[in-house]
Amino acid sequence: MFVYGDYLGDLKVTKLVRVWRTAALYEALRGKTEVLLKVAHPNDDCAERLKREALVLEALSPWQTGPAGFVRSFLPASRPVLPIIQAPYPNRSKRVHGEITFRGEPRVFSVLSFAKGKILSDLILENPQIWHYQAAWIVSTLAQALRPLVKSNKCHLSISPDIVLVDTDRDGNLRPILMDLGFIIDGGEVDGQYDWSRLSEPAYTAPELLAHTQARSIGLEADVYSLGIIFYEMLAGHPGFEAKLRRDEQVRDDVTQNRKPLPVGRPELEQAGVARVVERAIAPVGRFKDVLELSDALTAIYSAPPPERRTIPRRLYVLLATLGVVILGIGLVAGYLLLQVLLNNGR
């Protein structure tokens, strides 16, 4: 782990945000600019996962330069639901991830645009039973963040509250960012590729993945389970499967051997169909086919997350004022010329 003041190239580590199974997330400074720094653990599987994620994030990141970036700079920026990747080095690089040797050990890292907020698991500790509307909107937003993976028939397979950063907007609504894209693999590639018991959080991992079943049984519905169990935790006020002070093997056994629906314990939500959505999302079989279908089910009950009021960039006001002055100037010149023509004709 890195500590305050450590340098990774030109990046100064200022704060540890979270340690995950395959990487750690830090706040860092590049000069005077705040960024987020993700560093893979010194392991080939962890490094390859971060490299793969960096390529996907680059493909998904909005253009920051060129005509499209110039036009976008004048408009209110929508809040991203995925991290925006930045160049790994201060100079140009063909790679979107960085590689550097730190104290004799090769490390792979990526640099992300800074985002403020609290990790969802910390937020749940502060408020174990989040208002069910906000909980549903968080899950719906995370599902939409996974849309590019779903459309490519890729699985995340590592969703947990620890990889979600949540900020509160000016209206008090919770706005999440999915800070990690997971393994980004097809279900057919799952079998034997990774040690899931070591690289996944068993309390939030689909039982079929932990039970080492055949690869053909692993699909997009595995991520439905993870979002469903997070939704359950926010509604019920406690985890579906307690992981604190317990070994992974114990949690894994609880998940794979559970045969009973987990009770939400919220009678007021049953009539609206919320409990049925949760039950279907975390059922051993018969889940929603993917997270987008889960999002549709929640939207049918709660509607879509409310649009966020975003600050209008100052440069738009400057542009409008400049255009106003130019138009006024053109009008004055045109009026003066017209007046001169009329005076000359009157002579």
Where are the regions that the model predicts?
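ATP-binding glycine-rich loop module of kinase domains
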Residues: 29-59
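Protein kinase catalytic-loop region centered on the HRD/HxD motif
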Residues: 144-154
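Conserved short submotifs of the Hanks-type protein kinase catalytic core
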Residues: 103-119
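Conserved catalytic-loop aspartate of Hanks-type protein kinases
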Residues: 223
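Activation segment signature within eukaryotic-like protein kinase domains
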Residues: 138-139
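Conserved C-terminal C-lobe helix
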Residues: 269-282
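Conserved activation segment of eukaryotic-like protein kinases, specifically the C-terminal portion
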Residues: 194-209
